[in-house]
Regions:
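Solvent-exposed, non-transmembrane regions of membrane-associated and secreted proteins
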Residues: 17-256
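N-terminal Sec-pathway targeting helices
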Residues: 1-14
């Protein structure tokens, strides 16, 4: 009887080990695949386009930035490119209005992946644009996707990295960070700030109230604010010190 119990325990542990190993191998393979794919996309973005490249019209007034045109032709859900120095944040940004959270679990190539791809909230208008463009990205343990936003918790990092590059398909843009804060979502707790509900201000007072709330929650004072008429960029990722925690970086457009 003892031998049977012993054998059963060994078998159980073996199954658990095999399943765990399978998950680890799958995760490693996924990580390697995503890293290779985005490295290839970065190479396209950082390679000087050929002078003979014929630029497509994005609208009546604007043409594509050459390197982004090539990527757009691969996936027309692409709406921009985000980069933050000294982090791994150097990615295409997507938007799927018909399937809002598609890129939560799909990469640039539209294949399923736990890494997803940074994406814009579905009710944000990239054309007008909206007063606030909200971008989501995963906080991955290997430091990829939006895990690099965690560095902004340290004021000394912000002091050396006060700007974020977020280009649209037609315009190169720089944003200046005005606030970095932590909050919780999916709860009616007093600690919850539903920053994702602010896309367009109906009045100047609405805009000011949102900015003041962000500044009040900020982990440190940046000395920078925004006024009605400014365009905002809000970057959001998971923050694991609390259940349903989020780290949010808010910036304002300073050039276009």
């Amino acid at each position: 009887m003892k031998n049977k119990i012993y054998i059963a325990i060994i078998c159980a542990f073996s199954i658990v080990f095999a399943v765990s190993s399978g998950f680890l191998i799958k995760h490693y393979c996924d990580s390697a695949k995503q890293a290779e794919m985005y490295d290839n996309l970065i190479e396209v973005v950082e390679t000087e386009p050929e002078e003979t490249t014929e630029l497509m019209n994005y609208s009546e007034e604007k043409t594509f930035i050459p390197e982004y045109q090539e990527l757009y032709l691969q996936n027309n859900d692409m709406v921009g490119w985000i980069k933050i120095e000294d982090t791994k944040i150097n990615y295409p940004v997507m938007q799927s209005k018909d399937n809002p959270n598609f890129y939560l679990k799909h990469g640039f190539d539209k294949a399923y992946t736990d890494y997803g791809c940074p994406y814009v909230q579905e009710n944000c208008d990239m054309e007008l644009p909206s007063d606030n463009i909200i971008i989501y990205g995963h906080h991955m343990n290997d430091g990829s996707m939006f895990a690099g936003l965690m560095k902004f918790k340290d004021k000394s990092f912000w002091e050396k990295h006060k700007t974020v590059s977020f280009d649209t398909l037609t315009d190169r843009q720089t944003y200046e960070v005005i606030a970095v804060f932590k909050t919780v979502v999916y709860t009616d707790s007093p600690d919850s700030f539903k920053y994702y509900q602010f896309v367009n201000a109906e009045t100047a007072e609405d805009f000011t109230a949102y900015v003041e709330k962000c500044k009040k929650l900020s982990l440190y004072e940046t000395g920078i604010t925004a006024e009605y008429g400014d365009k905002l960029l809000t970057l959001s990722t998971c923050e694991y010190s609390r259940t349903n925690g989020r780290l949010v970086v808010v910036a304002k457009l300073i050039n276009e």
